[in-house]
């Protein structure tokens, strides 16, 4: 269970960071769309 043998595998912290940023971006877009009255374009 060492970090040196993770060749070919994506680090968990990188996955968590990208997923967290994607969720925050999606929530921001949805909230901004519903606030501006443009959220009904779905």
UniProtKB/Swiss-Prot annotation:
Q: What is this protein's function?
A: One of the components of the core complex of photosystem II (PSII). PSII is a light-driven water:plastoquinone oxidoreductase that uses light energy to abstract electrons from H(2)O, generating O(2) and a proton gradient subsequently used for ATP formation. It consists of a core antenna complex that captures photons, and an electron transfer chain that converts photonic excitation into a charge separation.
Q: Where is the signal peptide?
A: none
What Gene Ontology terms for biological process does this UniProt record contain? photosynthesis
Chief place where the protein resides: plastid
Q: Which GO terms describe its cellular component?
A: chloroplast thylakoid membrane; photosystem II reaction center
Record protein name field: Photosystem II reaction center protein J
Q: Which HAMAP family match?
A: PSII_PsbJ
Q: Which Pfam families match?
A: PsbJ
Similarity annotation: Belongs to the PsbJ family.
The record's keywords, sorted A to Z, are: Chloroplast, Membrane, Photosynthesis, Photosystem II, Plastid, Reaction center, Thylakoid, Transmembrane, Transmembrane helix
Q: Give the top-rank taxon of the lineage listed in the UniProt record for this protein.
A: Eukaryota
**Membrane-spanning residues:** 10-30
The listed locations are: Plastid, Chloroplast thylakoid membrane
Q: Is Transmembrane one of the keywords?
A: yes
How does it sit in the bilayer? Single-pass membrane protein
Q: How does it assemble?
A: PSII is composed of 1 copy each of membrane proteins PsbA, PsbB, PsbC, PsbD, PsbE, PsbF, PsbH, PsbI, PsbJ, PsbK, PsbL, PsbM, PsbT, PsbX, PsbY, PsbZ, Psb30/Ycf12, at least 3 peripheral proteins of the oxygen-evolving complex and a large number of cofactors. It forms dimeric complexes.
